[in-house]
Structure formats: structure tokens, C-alpha cells
Amino acid sequence: MKKVFFLFFIFKIAGFCFAADPVEGFWLSIDEKTGKITAGWHIYQEGGKLYGKILSTAAEPRGVLAGRCKDSYPGFPVAGKISIMPVAGTPWIYGLSKGKNGEWSGGSVINPEDGNIYKCKITFRPADGKKYKTDTLEMRGEIGLGIGRSQFWQKSDQAAASSLWPD
């Protein structure tokens, strides 16, 4: 009986250690000024860092390139000229390091619409029925000294995050 309890305890601990971080998954970015959905995102971990790719956009057609971006940015995780990469499928959020559960910082986010790069911090906000009606991701981009803006993204699924194309 002690062996069974011990094994149960070990598996329970292992489950907590290897559980996905709540920021991982599919999200819909919401414009903080208009309240409209702008894009579907996949947020994921790779090599201990956090990344985010656009899966679809509500305003741009499939296959649109990031023509307003520079050819390169510091620490960008994909080789090649960024200005000729597609908006969908490119990791515009990259290099974030884990803080406590649900908090990531120290990376960058590039706005593919204008090519601007910002320091990035992502914080998971669980649904509380008051301020956060659903699970929410606070996506903060800063130029430095705490100057920046936050967007609050809604939890989604892969199908919804992938199907926003206007065409």
C-alpha cells in the first residue's frame, strides 16, 4: 500500500511539473481602441522560451508579406529577410523567459503592420467573473521606462484562431 501511495504521489508531482503554462494555446488579439478582433495567435514554448505566431488576420488577405518590417531585428528566431516573410506563421513574439506561472517577459514583439519592435511582457489573467469574464492574456509592449500599451486577448481554440481571413 505504501508503494502505491508513493507512486501516486510521484505521478501527481510530475503532472504539476510538466503541465502547460496557461499562456500557451490559441488567442484572439483585440484592438484596445475599437474592441474588434484583429488576429488569431498561437502562443507556444520552444527551448524554454515563449513565442507567438499569427495564424490568421481579420483585415489582411492570406499570404500578405511583412513589407513594412526591416530585414532583420536583434535576436529574431528565424533566418532570412523578415520584410519578405508572411505575416501568418512568423513568430512576431519571441524570446520571452518564464517568471512565475502565467508570467513571461524579457523578449520582444514586432508589429508586422508598421515594423516597430517593443519589449514584451505577457501575463495570464484567469476568469474571475468580474474584471475578466473569460481567461485573458495581457499582452504588453513597451518602448522602455514602462512606457507602452497593453492589449487584452481572449482565449480561443485553433479553429477560431485560424479562420479570421477576410477573403
Predicted regions and their residues:
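N-terminal helix-cap/turn-to-beta initiation motif at the start of protein domains
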Residues: 17-26
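Short polar/acidic secondary-structure junctions
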Residues: 32-34, 112, 127-129, 142-145
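Sec-dependent N-terminal signal peptides
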Residues: 4-13, 17
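Edge beta-strand at a domain terminus
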Residues: 141-167
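Low-complexity, intrinsically disordered Gly/Pro/Thr-rich segments
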Residues: 133-142
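Central antiparallel beta-sheet cores of small beta-barrel/beta-sandwich binding domains
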Residues: 29-31, 36-120, 166
